[in-house]
Amino acid sequence: MARALPIRVVVVTMYESALETGNHFGEFRLWVERLPLNERIPFPYGFRDLRYNSEKSVIGIVSGVGTARAAASIMALGMDPRFDFTRAYWLVAGIAGVNPLEASIGPAAWVEWVVDADLAFEIDAREIPAEWSTGYWPLGKTRPYEQPVEADGAGWVYRLDPGLVTWTHWLTADLRLDDPPALREARSRYSTSRRLRRRPLCCAATRLAARPSGTALF
């Protein structure tokens, strides 16, 4: 049996609309083009073939949209005997929305806490009680922000390595991100938000995941 490839970094993305051609970009194509991930590895049990950079020992995967596809794809990758993930770092790279009162368009946010927001209740905004600030609350509770908080998050709250997240944020805090004319024009429409008018930057956030539209909370 051939020796398993030692992997240093796994880049996990959810979707890509046009990996090979076209002007539409999802979450994976720029990784393929710019890192680059220039080798294709067949991955019959996954959503799409894998991409690999042998010099950097970096592998990239498109997991597919939704919890079921993501779980199946990552399980298939983790159990694939062709790869050794013993010392690998996992970078989950996704697109999320952001409150325009908190950050500009196009930031890169490093996340310490990940919350699975599928496991929750939500009611029609027209029926939210007047004293509530939101109509969204977790399973096992009867109202938003009800105490006490579950000690272990009941399996839907995950904390990533805080030291690694802090180090990564420090390392990229002064990184100058792209700020093309189209992006500047888009944020100029938000004239009342001082933070949104700033150029994009690297920041820290919490990820609310697995909703129809992911959200980064600052």
Locate each region found by the language model:
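Accessory terminal and edge-of-domain segments that mediate assembly/interaction
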Residues: 1-218
